[in-house]
């Protein structure tokens, strides 16, 4: 069994994308490959088949490997809930919240969890394809590292280093990163991949020749810039949109300081009839057909931010003029009358008044709800699939008019008596074509085109595997994977 690791010179260098591409490239050949990320820091997460929580990038990589997501694919997930702290999730379950200093001391425990997961995957699959985090050359983070070279040294695996040429300085990034590694770590780097190149490759060739001569390591290939690649972002909100038709529905989403699972909105970005706008701090709230309150890792703090930025008055005005309002997970909790956090799970213990638009209250509890679900989205009763990731338990009379009837017999969320407001705990509901179309009709779009988001994602994964075939040295890659030339 072989482990191969992809590390990057910076965040957003293309690590997730390359691991996704390599997983599908190997799966096409019938190789049993599994994705793995030792430690991930992200607020976008997915629910696994075994009832845990991992980064969404690893869920996409699992799809590329033709596997169901599993907690061993991302044994340590850090979900920031303040500027200096994060909720620590190990093997899919929340352990506690820690500040950076406390987590540094906890890393020995985290490393053991990482190695346990890697050992299980190595026993079950031919190739473990590993994604690093950020950069391996962050001097202040190297002590006790479990995400990059610390992991590679622990399991004795080779490394590919990827860099993004589109941002400039690619040769400085690669040479500088290599120079900051120890001799044993430098020896692990088997070669380089340059990502997001546009232009004439012949003009780049002298630089590639210099890089190989300077470092003694091969350039494994140059991946082109793909203008319309729309895989789910791991951290930053992707604001690119597909081309729009003449008739569009205007949808507005506030960029909360602790917004979570903003990948919920990717299907809307790609929908030809939706004009999606993310609104940040200090920006005026534009007129819209639909306002969506997204998920949040710190609901009470983000609700205070909404009020401070004028959103409460803007929402009231929006509703007075007939606009629709949707709350998802933390956004649902904000719609109620009260949010209580007696245990201090998301910040200082206490409670906050909600927006008071639906008659229910929420109490945050230590036992987080994690499940994949399916059911019927009301009032049209169209099929919907999604997933729940929340610590809140909501109760109140508004829940007697649910938004979703789940197949397991439970009901979820609420719809206001006048039909203007809908709230649900379900993430991912826009990925269901029928549910997405029903929500767009509810928001005022008459003739809705159905878009199969899963088919679009599968198409992009296939395109990435094609790039491996045409632009990378596949003979060397096969050798790194222990498969021969």
UniProtKB/Swiss-Prot annotation:
<dbReference type="InterPro" id="IPR033949">
    <property type="entry name" value="CobQ_GATase1"/>
</dbReference>
<dbReference type="InterPro" id="IPR011698">
    <property type="entry name" value="GATase_3"/>
</dbReference>
<keyword id="KW-0315">Glutamine amidotransferase</keyword>
<feature type="active site">
    <location>
        <position position="427"/>
    </location>
</feature>
<dbReference type="InterPro" id="IPR047045">
    <property type="entry name" value="CobQ_N"/>
</dbReference>
<dbReference type="InterPro" id="IPR004459">
    <property type="entry name" value="CobQ_synth"/>
</dbReference>
<feature type="domain" description="GATase cobBQ-type">
    <location>
        <begin position="248"/>
        <end position="435"/>
    </location>
</feature>
<feature type="active site" description="Nucleophile">
    <location>
        <position position="329"/>
    </location>
</feature>
<dbReference type="InterPro" id="IPR029062">
    <property type="entry name" value="Class_I_gatase-like"/>
</dbReference>
<protein>
    <recommendedName>
        <fullName>Cobyric acid synthase</fullName>
    </recommendedName>
</protein>
<comment type="similarity">
    <text>Belongs to the CobB/CobQ family. CobQ subfamily.</text>
</comment>
<dbReference type="Pfam" id="PF01656">
    <property type="entry name" value="CbiA"/>
</dbReference>
<dbReference type="GO" id="GO:0015420">
    <property type="term" value="F:ABC-type vitamin B12 transporter activity"/>
</dbReference>
<dbReference type="Pfam" id="PF07685">
    <property type="entry name" value="GATase_3"/>
</dbReference>
<dbReference type="GO" id="GO:0009236">
    <property type="term" value="P:cobalamin biosynthetic process"/>
</dbReference>
<dbReference type="InterPro" id="IPR002586">
    <property type="entry name" value="CobQ/CobB/MinD/ParA_Nub-bd_dom"/>
</dbReference>
<dbReference type="GO" id="GO:0003824">
    <property type="term" value="F:catalytic activity"/>
</dbReference>
<keyword id="KW-0169">Cobalamin biosynthesis</keyword>
<comment type="pathway">
    <text>Cofactor biosynthesis; adenosylcobalamin biosynthesis.</text>
</comment>
<comment type="function">
    <text>Catalyzes amidations at positions B, D, E, and G on adenosylcobyrinic A,C-diamide. NH(2) groups are provided by glutamine, and one molecule of ATP is hydrogenolyzed for each amidation.</text>
</comment>
<dbReference type="InterPro" id="IPR027417">
    <property type="entry name" value="P-loop_NTPase"/>
</dbReference>
């Amino acid at each position: 069994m072989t482990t191969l690791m992809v590390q990057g010179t910076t965040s957003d260098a293309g690590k997730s994308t390359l691991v996704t591409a390599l997983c599908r490239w190997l799966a096409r050949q019938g190789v049993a490959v599994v994705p793995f990320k030792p430690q991930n820091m992200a607020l976008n997460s997915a629910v696994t088949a075994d009832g845990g929580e991992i980064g969404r990038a690893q869920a996409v990589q699992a799809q590329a490997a033709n596997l169901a997501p599993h907690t061993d694919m991302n044994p340590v997930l850090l979900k920031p809930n303040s500027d200096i702290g994060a909720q620590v999730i190990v093997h899919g379950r929340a352990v506690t919240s820690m500040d950076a200093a406390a987590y540094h001391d906890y890393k020995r425990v985290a490393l053991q969890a990482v190695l346990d997961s890697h050992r299980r995957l190595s026993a079950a699959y031919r190739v473990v394809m590993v994604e690093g985090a950020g950069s391996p050359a962050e001097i202040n983070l190297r002590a006790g590292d479990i995400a990059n070279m610390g992991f590679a040294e622990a399991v004795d695996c080779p490394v590919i280093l990827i860099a993004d040429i589109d941002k400039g300085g690619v040769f400085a990034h690669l040479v500088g990163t290599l120079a900051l590694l120890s001799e044993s770590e430098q020896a692990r780097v088997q070669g380089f991949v340059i990502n997001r190149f546009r232009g004439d490759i012949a003009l780049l060739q002298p630089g590639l020749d210099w890089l190989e001569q300077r470092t003694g390591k091969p350039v494994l290939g140059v991946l082109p810039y793909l203008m319309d690649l729309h895989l789910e972002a791991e951290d930053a909100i992707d604001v690119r949109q597909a081309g729009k038709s003449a008739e569009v529905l205007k949808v507005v989403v506030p960029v909360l300081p602790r917004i979570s699972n903003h990948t919920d909105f990717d299907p809307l970005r790609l929908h030809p009839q939706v004009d999606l706008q993310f609104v940040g701090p200090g920006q005026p709230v534009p007129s819209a057909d639909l306002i969506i309150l997204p998920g949040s890792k710190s609901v009470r703090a983000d609700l205070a931010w909404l009020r401070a930025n004028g959103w409460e008055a803007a929402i009231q005005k929006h509703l007075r003029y007939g606009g629709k309002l949707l709350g998802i997970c933390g956004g649902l909790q904000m719609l109620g009358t009260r949010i209580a956090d007696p245990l201090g799970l998301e910040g200082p213990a206490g409670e906050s008044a909600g927006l008071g638009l639906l008659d229910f209250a929420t109490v945050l509890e230590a036992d987080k709800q994690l499940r994949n679900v399916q059911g019927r989205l009301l009032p049209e009763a169209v099929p919907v699939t999604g997933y729940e990731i929340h610590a809140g338990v909501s109760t109140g009379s508004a829940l007697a008019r649910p938004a979703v009837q789940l197949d397991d017999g439970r009901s979820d969320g609420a719809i206001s008596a006048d039909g203007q407001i809908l709230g649900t705990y379900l993430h991912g509901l826009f990925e269901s074509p029928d549910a997405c179309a029903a929500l767009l009709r509810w928001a005022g779009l008459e003739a809705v085109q159905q878009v199969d988001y899963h088919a679009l994602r599968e198409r992009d994964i296939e395109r990435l595997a094609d790039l491996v075939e045409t632009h990378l040295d596949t003979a060397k890659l096969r050798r790194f994977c222990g498969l021969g030339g």
